[in-house]
Structure formats: C-alpha cells, structure tokens
C-alpha cells in the first residue's frame, strides 16, 4: 500500500487541511442545529417535570440536542488542531488527532442513528399519551404553555369531545386562538423535521470525517517512512 502514496507529505496534508476546513464549517452547522434543537426540544422538558414521560421523550428533550451541540463544539476545536498538526507535519499530534476523530465518528454515528430511529418511530403517540394525561390533571398549565409556543389548539380531533378548548390560547377579548390547528400535526411535523435534519447531518459529516481519517492515516505512514516528523 505504501508505494502508492505520494512521495512527499505535501500532497497528503493539503487535502487533509482542506477537509478539516470543511469539517470546521460543518461543525459550525452542528452547533447551530444543536442550539435550535436545544431551544425547541426544551419545551418537552416541562412534560418531563410533571412526571410520567417515556424514555424516548426524555432522550429527545435533553440528551439528543445537548449531544449534537457538544459534538459541534468539539468538532470545531478538533478540526483547528487537525489543520495545525497537518501543516506542521507533527506525527504525534496526527496520531492523537486520528484517535479523537475516530472516537468522535463513533459518537456521531450513534447520535445520527438515534435521531433517525426516533424519526422513524411513532414518537407522536408517546407525546399524545403524556399530553392527554397532563391535560386533565392539576398540571394543565403546562399544556397551555405548549399550545402557546406551538400556536395550536387541542391535541387532535378526539380532544374536541372533552372540551379541550378551555386550555387553548386566547386573545384579549377571550376569543380562542389557533382553533382548528391541532397540536399533533404541528408538533409531529416539527419534531420529525428536526430529527431528520440531525440524522442526515450526522451521516453526511460522518462520511467526510471518514475520508479525513484516511488522509490522516496515509500522512502518518508517509511521515514515518520519510522520517520527516519531528
């Protein structure tokens, strides 16, 4: 394999630096996506605080968005370090960079896979069960906050039989707002789109990261063979 590598490290480190710049930008995208998801899914923490929520809802409201945000920040730091060690041809630094990127790749695949799993699962049914349990309890104020945030009224048509409009947002004249806009449609669409975005971003970044890892490994081999590392 080694004989097919470029004769000088330059032809390996330049693509590696370019890939790290691309990954830095994608890391910034992850931070933005993570920030949006933290703000959005934090609304479901109120369901968690009043008790009785499933593990799926706990995961998408806390661990998943926080994980995406953390990975994005770590990605940005690591890719800057990758550019530096590649430019200076520091073999030890490249080894640590490769190990950390490999760990990050595994975590990224895990979070991306988790997001796509929840996207394909019927998470709406689990939200519905918790929603309706809370609607008719002494914690119904949580539903009022969620309906105000999502600009909807009643979870679905079946709620209309149970006078769900009593919890719907109202204007200054006590008129019901968003009547006919059911929360199931709004929430299910918003949750699914964000989960799909996280999963797709994880897969796309994982592919580019894998290519970057290959260039880093080839550069390590070339530096070792040429004894040019310091």
Curated annotation (Swiss-Prot):
Q: Which residues lie on this side of the membrane: Extracellular?
A: 42-65, 112-200
What keywords are annotated for this sequence in UniProt?
Glycoprotein, Membrane, Transmembrane, Transmembrane helix
Q: Which GO terms describe its cellular component?
A: membrane
Going by the UniProt annotation, this protein carries glycans at 133, 138, 163, 179
Location of this chain's protein in the cell: Membrane
Kindly give the Pfam families that the UniProt entry links to this protein.
Tetraspanin (PF00335)
Coiled-coil ranges per the record?
A: none
Give the transmembrane ranges: 21-41, 66-86, 91-111, 201-221
Give the membrane topology, semicolon-separated if more than one. Multi-pass membrane protein
Q: What is this protein called?
A: Probable tetraspanin tspD
Origin organism lineage = Eukaryota, Amoebozoa, Evosea, Eumycetozoa, Dictyostelia
């Amino acid at each position: 394999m080694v004989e097919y590598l470029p004769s000088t490290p330059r032809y390996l480190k330049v693509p590696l630096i370019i890939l790290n710049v691309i990954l830095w930008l994608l890391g910034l995208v992850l931070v933005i996506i993570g920030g949006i998801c933290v703000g959005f899914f934090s609304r479901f923490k109120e369901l968690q605080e009043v008790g009785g929520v499933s593990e799926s809802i706990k995961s998408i409201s806390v661990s998943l968005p926080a994980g995406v945000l953390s990975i994005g920040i770590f990605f940005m730091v690591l890719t800057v370090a990758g550019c530096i060690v590649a430019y200076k041809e520091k073999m030890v630094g490249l080894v640590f960079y490769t190990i950390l990127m490999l760990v990050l790749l595994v975590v990224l695949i895990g979070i991306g896979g988790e997001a796509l799993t929840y996207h394909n699962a019927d998470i709406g049914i689990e939200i519905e069960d918790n929603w309706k349990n809370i609607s008719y309890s002494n914690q119904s104020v949580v539903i009022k906050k969620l309906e105000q945030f999502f600009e909807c009224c009643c979870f679905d048509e079946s709620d209309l039989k149970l006078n769900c409009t009593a919890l719907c947002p109202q204007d200054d004249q006590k008129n019901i707002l968003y009547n006919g806009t059911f929360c199931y449609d709004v929430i299910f669409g918003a949750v699914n789109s964000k989960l799909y975005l996280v999963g797709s971003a994880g897969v796309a970044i994982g592919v580019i990261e894998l290519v970057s890892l290959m260039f880093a490994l080839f550069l390590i081999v070339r530096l070792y063979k040429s004894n040019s590392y310091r």
